[in-house]
Each structure stands twice: as C-alpha cells, then as structure tokens.
Amino acid sequence: MESLFPAPYWEVLYGSHFQGNLSLLNETVPHHLLLNASHSAFLPLGLKVTIVGLYLAVCIGGLLGNCLVMYVILRHTKMKTATNIYIFNLALADTLVLLTLPFQGTDILLGFWPFGNALCKTVIAIDYYNMFTSTFTLTAMSVDRYVAICHPIRALDVRTSSKAQAVNVAIWALASVVGVPVAIMGSAQVEDEEIECLVEIPAPQDYWGPVFAICIFLFSFIIPVLIISVCYSLMIRRLRGVRLLSGSREKDRNLRRITRLVLVVVAVFVGCWTPVQVFVLVQGLGVQPGSETAVAILRFCTALGYVNSCLNPILYAFLDENFKACFRKFCCASSLHREMQVSDRVRSIAKDVGLGCKTSETVPRPA
C-alpha cells in the first residue's frame, strides 16, 4: 500500500478530519482530500464530547494563566529580565494557539468545518507558528541559561532584555518560513457535501508530503531538543564542578533556581509533545491508524500537546518565587478591590437609607 502520510499528518496538527477506516484507504483519492472522510463519524459521540470538553478546559485555564503571566511581566519592571522576556514570548504563542481550540473542538464535534476559508487559514497558520515559536523559544531559553551558568562574565553583555526581545522577533520571523506557506496552502474545501479545513500538498504528494513532514519533525522537535540537551549537559557538568557560581550566595541560588525552572518547562514540553510527534513520524513511514482505539489515541496525543500550553503558568507559580509573589499580589489586589467595591456600595446604600429616613422625619404628617 502506498504511503498516505500527508492527510493524517495535517489532521494531527490542526483538527480537520482524517480517514480511519482501512477499507477506504484502497480507494483512488488524491492525498490532500483524504482528510474529508470524517473521522468524527468514526469515533463515538461520547469520546468526541470528552475530547471537546478537554479542549475547552485547556482553553479557558490556559488563557487565564498565560494572560496573567504576560500581564505580570508587562506590569512589573523587575520582571523584565532576559529569561522572562522569553517566557512572555512562550505565553504569547500559547495564548494564540489556545484561541483556536474552540474552533477545532467544534470541527471535531460537528464533523465538518463551519467557519469559512479565512479562519481555516488562520487556524492552520497559528498552529504551525505555535509549534515553531515554542520550540525555538525554549531553545533560546536553554542557550540563555547556558551562557548565564557557564560564561557568567560574557553573560553581562549578552543577557539583556533588549537582546532577548530581538531574539523573540527573529524567532517569529523564522517561524514565518513555515507559517506563511501553510497558510497559503490551507483552505476550506467542499468534498462530499462537507466543508473540510485542510492543507493541500503540492504534487507529487507521494514525494512532498513525507519530505515536508520529516523536515518539520526535525526542525520543530528533534534538532531543538538536541540543542537543549547539549546545553543542559554542559550546565550540569558546570554546576557539579563548582560550589559557588558567583561571588554571592544569593545570586548563586537565584541562578540555580531559574535554571531549574527552565529545565522543568522544557521537560514538560518534551513530555507533552513527544507522543504526537512519534505518532506522526510513524505515520510518515506509512503506518496508518486503522482502528477506533488508534484514532482515539491519536486525538488524545494531540490534546496532550495543547495541554502543555496551560501547564506553563502553573509551573511558574510553583517554581519561581518572583512569579509566585506577583500572582499572589494580583489575586490579593483583585480581592481587595472587590471588597472595597462592596464596602462602597454598602456605605452608599446606608447613606441613601439614612437620607431617606431623615427626609421622612422632617416632612409634616397629614392631619
């Protein structure tokens, strides 16, 4: 059987519909249209509702958390460090992709794409931008940690917030190399009286599909993870080799704390994205999911990748004292503001009641 990789691969990344029934794989259908045999009908309604519910929960929780992270970094001057500038970029990418989940969830539940061509292109582009900006940002954070730990003198000139901002701009520009073309190739197409959101692979699909997919796998996952691994291997060797990295124990403790935070964020990212990346790679080699169980696993692996986008704010709150303090301050300020509003409202009502009573006492009673 010839490889049918392109269709399931695009399905994984932005939630269109792919072929899960092996009997249909033998039909003569162009590769870029195989997504149109909706797998949503192939999955039980209960499973679809579960996946959509997970998408919505991730969307709501992730948006609240990531927006709070961005607010804290913008609001407090002390939070505008090089590491936090990268964290802001990560939160921005996560926020954008989380905004697409209601549309993807609707697509899964209905079994077709109801939102038109422009939104289809937008969702596809955001998914790819998120994939590349996230891995590139984590790589930049790891290199930044490596410089801070292994080259502390050089770090004084290299690790500035302005240079971190420039790196973030370069990351988005580099991600556009993939984001713009897939947005152009993406479209909402009508097939069998259903509208499907998909990416049309250029002909010949047998060649360009696997080549493009393997390139994405390498540049969005394998190569960044290798760079990150090398950076942390060198950092661990450095941390074990010296007891004091800087002249101050407090500064040394802060360096180790931030390094641990970045390491945990990277580890969680790799843990969340490895299953779907491996699944996609297996499909690229020509092995297709042909059972309800395989389709369900693929869907949940995809959802796990999105779950990562709402986990980062939780990690910051637990592992970084500065974020924890800012989050606590924000929550306390919000609570105090609500209490003051309630108190002002009560005083206003009491004042009105008092004036009313006083007025009624001064008005002469009728004889």
Swiss-Prot record:
Belongs to the G-protein coupled receptor 1 family. G-protein coupled opioid receptor that functions as a receptor for the endogenous neuropeptide nociceptin. Ligand binding causes a conformation change that triggers signaling via guanine nucleotide-binding proteins (G proteins) and modulates the activity of down-stream effectors. Signaling via G proteins mediates inhibition of adenylate cyclase activity and calcium channel activity. Arrestins modulate signaling via G proteins and mediate the activation of alternative signaling pathways that lead to the activation of MAP kinases. It comes from the Eukaryota. InterPro entries: GPCR_Rhodpsn (IPR000276), GPCR_Rhodpsn_7TM (IPR017452), Opioid_rcpt (IPR001418), X_opioid_rcpt (IPR001420). The chain crosses the membrane at residues 46-71, 85-106, 122-143, 163-185, 209-233, 262-282, 298-319. GO terms for biological process: adenylate cyclase-inhibiting G protein-coupled receptor signaling pathway; calcium-mediated signaling; conditioned place preference; eating behavior; estrous cycle; negative regulation of adenylate cyclase-activating G protein-coupled receptor signaling pathway; negative regulation of blood pressure; negative regulation of cAMP/PKA signal transduction. This is Nociceptin receptor. Residues 1-45, 107-121, 186-208, 283-297 are extracellular. Residues 72-84, 144-162, 234-261, 320-367 are cytoplasmic. GO terms for cellular component: cytoplasmic vesicle; neuron projection; plasma membrane; synaptic membrane. It is found in: Cell membrane; Cytoplasmic vesicle. GO terms for molecular function: G protein-coupled receptor activity; neuropeptide binding; nociceptin receptor activity. It holds the Pfam family 7tm_1. The keyword Disulfide bond applies. The gene is Oprl1. CDD domains: 7tmA_NOFQ_opioid_R. The keyword Protease does not apply. A lipid is attached at C331 (S-palmitoyl cysteine). Glycans are attached at N21, N26, N36. Phosphorylation at Ser-360 requires GRK3. PANTHER family: NEUROPEPTIDES RECEPTOR, NOCICEPTIN RECEPTOR. The record marks D107, D127 as: Important for G protein-mediated signaling. Keywords: Behavior, Cell membrane, Cytoplasmic vesicle, Disulfide bond, G-protein coupled receptor, Glycoprotein, Lipoprotein, Membrane, Palmitate, Phosphoprotein, Receptor, Transducer, Transmembrane, Transmembrane helix. Highly expressed in several brain areas, the intestine, liver and spleen. Detected in sympathetic stellate ganglion neurons.
